[in-house]
Amino acid sequence: MRVALSPFRAQRSLAARRERGGRARRRRALYWGFIYAAATAVASVVLAPFVWLLISSVADPRDLLARPLRWIPEHVSFARYSSIFVGGMSDTADTFRAALVNSAIIAGSSVLISLTVGILGAYATARLRFPGRRVGLVLMLSTYMLPPIAIVVPLYLTMVQLHLLDTRIGLIVVYCSFITPFTLWIMSGYFRSIPRELEDAARVDGCSRLGALVRVTLPLAWPGILATALFGFLLAWDEFLYALIFTSSTHAKTIPVAIAEFTGRFAVDFGMIATGGVLASIPPLFIAFVFQRYIVGGLSAGAIK
């Protein structure tokens, strides 16, 4: 009797295993389907404004003001881009071109100065032991607790006394004041994640402390430096409040201020605002795509320690 039932039990066991495997595969399919659907929904929400910005930059004004809204414009034109870069000699085009140059100079200079000062300060905080080290780091980071509008008046009075109003140097000084603490915070954590023994070995071979920093530590900290530089560049590139208050001429105006001035007294040029937004977003996007693999690793290593 037992021998006769064995094939039947074996078939039932095989069928049960197949059924369990089928249920597991269906659960995995449902799980990954949900993950992909959620990722698609989030990506759509994130990318939709930028897609609409691109459409608005090439759409005819009649399409932008049409009711109901036309998601696909009937007339496509790149005249706004050509007016800015090719043949445009209007005040709007001149202002935007000057603002583009100003933003590149101010953001780049602010990042270079902040990295130089912040890396040295972060290395000292991570490697040296001196009184007030932690207190100084906390005080520098506490500047982020104040809203920007709260320190506008002191900064404005300082700029007046130093004769730096409406100058690129003035904005560079202001931007360094909040990029440097960010650099100090990220890089101090990154330096602590690098083994001290590597620097000790370099110093045994004859390197000074500064030489060990330049030849050993900085090459290992390159991902953190790139991540910090990118975020510092974004802070300076997108800043609006200080640039609006401390500048008044095309000699020092940045892109956010120039885009805001596309709004006239009696009319709003939505197409030019969209064109300016697209052009302003290209440099940060390009930098982010090129160095994206360093950004996550750099920030995570700097935040863990």
Question: Regions from the language model: what does each represent?
Answer:
Residues 1-26:
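Short, Lys/Arg-rich, polar N-terminal cytosolic tail immediately upstream
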